[in-house]
Amino acid sequence: MKNLKERRLWLLWKKQERNGKTAKVPFAANGGKCGTSEEYKQTWVTYQEAEQAAKKFKGAGVGIVIPQNHFFLDIDHQDQNDPVVKDILSRFNTYTEYSVSGDGIHVYGLCDFSKLPTYTEDGRVKLSKEYYAHHPTNGMELYIGQLTNRYAAYTGNAILDVPLADCTTAVIDILNEYMRKPEAKAKEIKTTDLGKRADSIIQALRRQ
């Protein structure tokens, strides 16, 4: 995380109740308004500046805006020894930490932006609509710099304290195995079935 800590990508956050749920709301190191879009870029600071500023605000945490060609995977409320979690973590040899609550896991790393499933809307490249960025049932969130426009609540409570590594293949696998929307899966199965039927027909014709 050393290189990222030196870049002006950092902000603060605080917990607030919104619609009956607790949200981590971002704010600037000077206490002002902040966000993850380019219009707030001038409010982002280095990690050291954010860490110092957090001491001035009760209950404040430090967060990082996920930059292009980087990703953040949040596995919420899951134990490290859970079979699914073990399977996921085995694919990533990159910086990993405990979440703010201590009962979740954060994975940070690099990924090749050009190899990910995307589409363009209003001149902006976004993650394909076939995938969730925040899965509604399995508690997983996958944010990719410049595609999902989000920030991560950083803790520094490391599980695997190693340099950020390129995990493009693992990110694509996680998207397909854990973040794919049901309608996209159904479409894929239907297409596969049609392909099998076509192959069967062709084979039958050849035997005639």
Kindly label every feature range from the protein language model.
Residues 10, 71, 94, 105:
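Residue-level detector of short, conserved catalytic/binding motifs and their immediate flanks
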Residues 6-8, 101-103:
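Short, basic and Ser/Thr-rich N-terminal targeting/leader segments
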Residues 2-5, 11-17, 27-43, 47, ...:
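DNA replication initiation modules
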Residues 51, 91-97:
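An amphipathic, hydrophobic-aromatic interaction surface with interspersed Lys/Arg
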Residues 62-65, 95-101:
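Short beta-strand
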Residues 51-54, 62:
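Electrostatic, structured charged patches in enzyme active sites and in nucleic-acid/phosphate-binding
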Residues 22-24:
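Short linear proline/tyrosine/threonine-rich motifs used for host-factor recruitment
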Residues 102-110:
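Beta-rich nucleic-acid/ligand-interaction surfaces
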